[in-house]
Design a protein with these regions (language model features):
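Conserved C-terminal RecA-like helicase domain
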Residues: 51-163, 179-180
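The feature captures the C-terminal accessory region of ATP-dependent helicases
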Residues: 252-261
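Short, solvent-exposed loop/turn and secondary-structure capping segments
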Residues: 15-18, 86-87, 166-167, 185-186
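Hydrophobic/aromatic beta-strand patches that form the interior of the parallel beta-sheet core
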Residues: 2-4, 31, 126, 174, ...
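Post-DEXD/H (motif II) to motif III coupling segment of the RecA-like Helicase ATP-binding lobe
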Residues: 1-45
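A structural signal for short, well-ordered beta-strand segments and their strand-loop junctions
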Residues: 4-6, 74-76, 175
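Conserved RecA-like P-loop NTPase helicase motor core
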Residues: 131-242
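A short acidic, often aromatic-flanked loop/helix-cap motif at beta-alpha or helix-coil junctions
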Residues: 35-43, 56-59, 131-137, 212-214
């Protein structure tokens, strides 16, 4: 009889490893298959970019600069109770769509919005933040049965479209708000790293509030985060770096730590 231990992540939960080191030693030899090996085996997708963008005030003011509407993009808005959620989730979705362009039509069968950009292009935009169950199910059924690249241009989500969601034409993931969980970040990155014809580069961008700190401190914090994500994609056992980004609008009475910038 053979017993095999498999995990897609060393850091599930980001605080407690899936397996203790002494238990892991019982399963030898260990075989790792990381994201970079996966990319090397792809036919079309050859590179992955990971970066951070910053906003001041409300994130909606930076959406146009951070979002490339010529790329197939998955947008994750901040958690409902997150400090970057400046209004209700439905209003945030409406504001994002308004930054993309003007809604000129909607497919009632699938609840796909047709949005005209300022330069005249028509984009197909899906809203998975919608609470109406029949509407969500209709859209999800549509997403699960997409057969062409032109079926969707932009998808806006909140807590869905992460693990297990397959949109092979997705080129970019724009995630708004600080994500403390490396597991969540790697899950989201996985949404844009599917191999398909016509896609040579995938991009993950985290749009976060600009800290009230010196450029050097911000750079150090971002580099720590990028290193942690890179190590995670290599399937190394790492824990998420803990940085508390203080912005000008944060409560001044909020206690500081040596990881506050």
């Amino acid at each position: 009889a053979h017993i095999m231990a498999m995990t897609g992540s060393y850091f599930r939960g980001d605080a407690v490893p899936v397996m203790r080191p002494e238990d892991e030693q019982l399963f030898q030899p260990a075989i790792n298959y990381n994201y970079y090996q996966q990319l090397n085996g792809y036919k079309y997708l050859k590179s992955l970019g990971i970066g951070y963008a910053f906003f001041q005030g409300q994130y909606i003011t930076a959406i146009r600069e951070a979002l490339d509407t010529t790329k197939k993009t998955l947008i994750h808005i901040p958690p409902v109770q997150g400090r970057d959620a400046y209004t209700g989730k439905h209003d945030q979705v409406a504001d994002i769509i308004a930054q993309i362009g003007e809604v000129v039509d909607e497919e009632p069968e699938h609840f796909i919005k047709i949005v005209r950009t300022p330069d005249g292009r028509l984009l197909r935009v899906g809203d998975l933040v919608e609470d109406n169950i029949p509407m969500r199910r209709s859209l999800q059924a549509y997403l699960n049965n997409m057969k062409s690249r032109d079926a969707l241009d932009i998808l806006i989500a909140l807590g869905t479209a992460k693990e297990g969601f397959d949109w092979e034409w997705c080129e970019c993931c724009l995630t708004i708000g600080i994500r403390a969980s490396l597991t969540e970040v790697v899950q989201i990155i996985g949404r844009c790293t599917r191999d398909c014809a016509g896609k040579t580069h995938a991009q993950f961008t985290n749009l976060i509030p600009c800290p009230e700190a010196a450029q050097e401190e911000v750079g150090a914090a971002v580099n720590d985060m990028l290193k942690a994500i890179t190590a995670s994609l290599l399937m190394e056992q790492v824990m998420a770096p803990k940085w508390d980004f203080r912005t000008k609008r944060d409560d001044e009475e909020q206690p500081e730590t040596d990881r506050t910038i």
